[in-house]
Amino acid sequence: VRDGYIVDDKNCVYHCIPPCDGLCKKNGGKSGSCSFLVPSGLACWCKALPDNVPIKDPSYKCHKR
């Protein structure tokens, strides 16, 4: 398990909607909160996510189209 900014399959963060605590728990984490991530803005930070749930990799950009 690890802590981090939860992301979708394109390495894009979730922007605090839906509420982070529910999103993180739904994905197997212990808890979640809204935090500021440069340059993404407000994003969901999760504690104790399972290893199979993707978290933000700063070496790759978000690839939304």
Curated annotation (Swiss-Prot):
The entry's note on the tissues where this protein occurs is: Expressed by the venom gland.
Q: Which UniProt keywords apply?
A: Disulfide bond, Ion channel impairing toxin, Neurotoxin, Secreted, Toxin, Voltage-gated sodium channel impairing toxin
Q: Which InterPro entries match?
A: LCN-type_CS_alpha_beta_dom, Scorpion_toxin-like, Scorpion_toxin-like_sf, Scorpion_toxinL, Scorpion_toxinL/defensin
* GO annotation (BP), single: defense response
Annotated disulfide bonds: 12-62, 16-34, 20-44, 24-46
Q: Where in the cell is it found?
A: Secreted
> Which cellular component appears as one GO term in the record?
extracellular region
- The source's superkingdom equals Eukaryota
Q: Main site of residence?
A: secreted
Name the CDD domains for this protein: neurotoxins_LC_scorpion
Q: What family does this chain come from, according to its entry?
A: Belongs to the long (4 C-C) scorpion toxin superfamily. Sodium channel inhibitor family. Alpha subfamily.
Function statement: Alpha toxins bind voltage-independently at site-3 of sodium channels (Nav) and inhibit the inactivation of the activated channels, thereby blocking neuronal transmission. Electrophysiological studies of this were performed using sodium-channels expressed in F11 cell culture, by patch-clamp recordings. Affinity of this toxin toward sodium channels in F11 cell line is in the order of 1 uM concentration.
Domain comment (free text): Has the structural arrangement of an alpha-helix connected to antiparallel beta-sheets by disulfide bonds (CS-alpha/beta).
This protein's name: Sodium channel alpha-toxin Acra4
